[in-house]
Amino acid sequence: MLRTSTPNLCGGLHCRAPWLSSGILCLCLIFLLGQVGLLQGHPQCLDYGPPFQPPLHLEFCSDYESFGCCDQHKDRRIAARYWDIMEYFDLKRHELCGDYIKDILCQECSPYAAHLYDAENTQTPLRNLPGLCSDYCSAFHSNCHSAISLLTNDRGLQESHGRDGTRFCHLLDLPDKDYCFPNVLRNDYLNRHLGMVAQDPQGCLQLCLSEVANGLRNPVSMVHAGDGTHRFFVAEQVGVVWVYLPDGSRLEQPFLDLKNIVLTTPWIGDERGFLGLAFHPKFRHNRKFYIYYSCLDKKKVEKIRISEMKVSRADPNKADLKSERVILEIEEPASNHNGGQLLFGLDGYMYIFTGDGGQAGDPFGLFGNAQNKSSLLGKVLRIDVNRAGSHGKRYRVPSDNPFVSEPGAHPAIYAYGIRNMWRCAVDRGDPITRQGRGRIFCGDVGQNRFEEVDLILKGGNYGWRAKEGFACYDKKLCHNASLDDVLPIYAYGHAVGKSVTGGYVYRGCESPNLNGLYIFGDFMSGRLMALQEDRKNKKWKKQDLCLGSTTSCAFPGLISTHSKFIISFAEDEAGELYFLATSYPSAYAPRGSIYKFVDPSRRAPPGKCKYKPVPVRTKSKRIPFRPLAKTVLDLLKEQSEKAARKSSSATLASGPAQGLSEKGSSKKLASPTSSKNTLRGPGTKKKARVGPHVRQGKRRKSLKSHSGRMRPSAEQKRAGRSLP
C-alpha cells in the first residue's frame, strides 16, 4: 500500500515513518515497494503514517484542522508557498486562481494524501501534484494554466499545460475516481467513519502489530521500572529476566537468572515457574523489585515464593543475587493454579494474586481454598512491604484491610473467591480527566464452562468455587444466601476460548482511539478482545479485535499475524500496549515473541509522544533486534513476485519462440530460493527440542486442551489455565 521515494531522496521525508516508535524506520524500500500493485485505499499521509487530529487551529488549510495530515508548522509552510506563488499574479488572476491554488496545495493535508498523490500505487509515477477530478481539473486548466509552472517543475506537466488541457488532466487522473479531489471530500463511505478505529463487516476492530522481541522462552511478564529510562524487563517462565533498551536492543547478559532455583519443566502446560515481577514505586531511590516464582523447599515441598531483591550498585542492568529477601512463602497442594501476579496499587501497597492451589474444582476442605478466609490460596493479598510486621514477618498488614478484625481470617486478604487470576493490571486513568485511575482489572481462568474478567474491590468475594462466571458451579454453595459475590464485568464461554489472559486499559499516547479500551485475550484460542464501559449504565460492551488486512496494515514495519498462544499483556513506561505470545508453549522452547499494538486509523499529532529517556549506563553488549515475522509489505512483495513468475512462465509456455531474443538466446527465470533460520532465544545455547512517496514520469523501482492446558493427567486437563 505504501511507496517510498527513489534513491536520490533516501533519508528524506518519505524514507522514514516517524510516527512509528522504537526506531522503526522505513528504509528506502524501493525494490520491495516497486513490486507491490495497487491496493484499496485507506487514510494515509505522505509520510506513510496514519492521519491525526492537529493539536492547534490550522490558519490556512482549515478544512483539515479536525483530522488530516498537517500540523500547524506544515500548515504555515504551505501558506508561505501559496503567497510566494500569488506574488506572480495581478488582482484579477489572484481572484480567479487563488482558491484553486490553495485547494491543490492543501491536499498534502488531506487524510487521503497518499492516495491523492498516488503514493500507494507503486506501478505508476509518483505525483508532485494531487490527483484532480476531470471537471475540476478542466476548470483549473482553463482559468489558471499559467500557474502550473509555479506549482510544479515536472517537465511533462509543464509541457502539457500550454497545449492541451485534456492531456494535462489525463496526467493528473487517478485510477479510482472516488479518491480524486474534490470527490474524495464528498464520498460518504470514505468520510463517514474517518478517524475512527476501522471495523470489518462483523464489527471487529482492526488493529495492526509491530514485532519488538522474539526468541523468548515462554515470556510470562514484561514490566518497566518507572525510573524514566524506558527500559522494559522481560521474564521467561524458566527464570531468566532480560533487559530491553529504548532503541529496541537487548542486553546480552540477563538482568536476573534463577534457572537453578525456579521450579518448572519442559512439558506443555506446566504452570509452575517464574511467574511475576514488579518494581517498587520508589525504585529509582531504593533499587528494590519483587519476584514471584515456584520452588521446592529443603523438604521438596512445592511452594510459591514472593521475594524482595535489589539492583546491583555496580550495574543498573543486573540484579544483586545476594540481596534476595523472602517476603512470603505459600505451600502449593498441587502443581497447577499457581497465580503469579504482583503489582503495586496507587496506595503504595503490594497486591499479590494467588491461585486456589490446583486440581479440578478446588476440592480442598468443605468449600475449597478460595472461599476459606484462613487460607492464602485463591486470594488477593494486600501487604505493606515498606515496614516489617510482628512475629518476624517481613511485611506489615495495612490496618484498613477488610478482614483484619474477622476471627479466623488471614489479615493480609483483600479479596477472595478466586480460581486462578492470570494477569491483572492497574488502570492509569484517562490522560486528561484521570477517570478510572487506580482500578484493578484481572482475568480469572475458568473450569469447564466460562472465563471471566473482574474488577477488584476491597473485601470482594469473586464466587469461586460456588460460581464460574455468572453461572453456578457448586450448586450448594451457589445458593447460599451469604455468598454475596461480586459478579464479573464480562464472561465468555469456552466456544470463544478456554483460558483468559487479563490485559490492560489503554492509556498511551500513540493510538488515541484506543483510550479507555480494556484489551485482553485468550491463551488457547489466540483471540484478542476489548471491553468498553458505558458510563451511563456502567455495563461493559465487548468487541473482538482483528488484525487488519493487507490494506489497513500496509505500513512500514507492521504485521498482521501473531503467535497463537497469548501468555501475557504489558504496558511500557509511556503507556503503550503490548502482548506476549508463543507458538509452542513450553518453558524451554524459544518460540515466544512480543508484539506492540498499532492503530492504523489514527495516530497522535507529530511530536506529541516524543520522550527523552533517562540515560542508563550499560556494561553488557547490546544485541540489535532482528524481526522474524514477515511484515505486510513483505507478504505483498512475495505475492507480487509469485504472480510475476507465474505470468512469465505462462508466456514462455505459450510459445517457446517468445522467450528468445533476436540472437536466439533464451531468458531464464530466476528460481526462488529459501533459507532456514535456526531460532535461538536470548541465552539459549542449544535449540530446544520441541514438537511437531519523485518527480512526474519517474517510477520507483494444534495444540488442544480443556480449560486452557495440555495436562499429563485427565484430572489436570480439566483444571486451570494453560501456561503458565
From Swiss-Prot:
Region described as Disordered: 643-724
Alphabetical UniProt keywords: Disulfide bond, Glycoprotein, Secreted, Signal
Cysteine pairings via disulfide bonds: 204-546, 208-553, 424-442, 509-609
Skewed-composition ranges (Basic residues): 683-709
Residues carrying sugar: 480
Subcellular location: Secreted
Chief location category: secreted
One cellular component term from this protein's GO annotations in UniProt: extracellular region
Signal peptide residues on this chain, from the entry's feature table: 1-41
Record carries keyword Signal: yes
Family indicated by similarity: Belongs to the HHIP family.
Protein name (Swiss-Prot/TrEMBL): HHIP-like protein 2
